[in-house]
């Protein structure tokens, strides 16, 4: 190859590489409106270090803590886990109209209320704001997020009553409001949750009153009402043909005849009724619950012999003690 041709080829290669950066700049996938919204969120969080990859000169689809849709290249996920954020949730989060998933989890310095701007997120399916320091009332407008499937506000400082509108989303499958400071009664509207195989967590609050009978119309897979101040008869939650796997009702003031209870025999793996005012005896049908792994009826007013069979004798005496006159293995024999 002649020296002239070599120099020409080298010049061509250098010229080609020189224009590559300008080509890359014009090929950014991130939507400009989404990028501006994210940068406003970063500014509201005082340029938190956890968001340091959010650089205005780079493609936001390549940033950490967010995810772009593979086709539209719009931001569909905002996820910041385990610290790094302080202040309140910026209203600019509502300026990401294609968001489907929000996960702000274990942010002890995340405070304030849930902003009303989230109402604009009509595509939102998963909203997790757990293990933070959010406070104030739970906003009823969350029930207007029609595509919501999973709502988790657990481990915060929310107060006030449970909005009846939270059961409105037609595909809601999981509602977690546990570990807050909620008061008042359980709204009857929660008996209209329509999502398949629903989960309901209301434990560790200050809820009062009776469990609405209409909750028995919902085939909950998991229900936890423990550690409240609830009373009355929650036995509509039970049923031989229900699909419940875990039922936690401990440390309330429930009062019903356990002898008449029909446990979900094919699916139940956990039943905790300790520290209530439950009377009667343990039904023989409990011996047919073949997958039972957690069982506790201690600190109630039960009497009679513990039925023999199934898994009932695999639990130690602490699952049965401090009842009125319960007897039989693993307790003392009946006289």
Placement of each model-derived feature along the sequence:
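LRR flanking "cap" motifs
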Residues: 43-91, 253-260, 328-335
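Consensus "Asn ladder" position of solenoid repeat domains
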Residues: 83, 107-108, 132, 153-156, ...
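Leucine-rich repeat
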Residues: 64-65, 69-150, ...
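Tandem repeat domain/solenoid detector
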Residues: 98-100, 116, 120-125, 131-140, ...
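The feature encodes a structural signal of leucine-rich repeats
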Residues: 89-91, 111-116, 135-140, 159-164, ...
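Leucine-rich solenoid repeat scaffolds
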Residues: 284-335
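Surface-exposed cap/linker segments adjacent to membranes
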Residues: 2-65, 315
